[in-house]
Amino acid sequence: PNEAVTFAKESNVDAMAVSAGNTHLQTNKIAKIDLEKIKEIQNSISTPLVLHGGSGIPNLIRKKLARETNIAKFNIGTELRMTFGNALRKQVKNNPLIYDRLQLLKPTIPEITKITKKIIKNFGPQ
């Protein structure tokens, strides 16, 4: 928390990424988030927080963090890239004679849309 206070004051950032058990490029949801550390930081500064490695945070924990902290942004790129990669692999495997990139990529869009909607819904009330 002390480093966060110093950094926020000296840099005047709009948002601050913090590390509290989250890891970049985590492909499974096993991150053990230190909620107390996040709360200590948020109580020390007025700057909104960002969590990188959001793909590795279990959905219920992400939802709890979204409701109980001032985390304004969860990075979930790995989750989206994994969905895209799996959809593209399936398309290539099932259509070995298609070489046009647009035809190969188009079927990935519904999969990305589906996972994105699911992620957003998981942040909301249920």
Predicted regions and their residues:
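Active-site mouth loops of central-metabolism enzymes
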Residues: 1-2, 51, 104-107
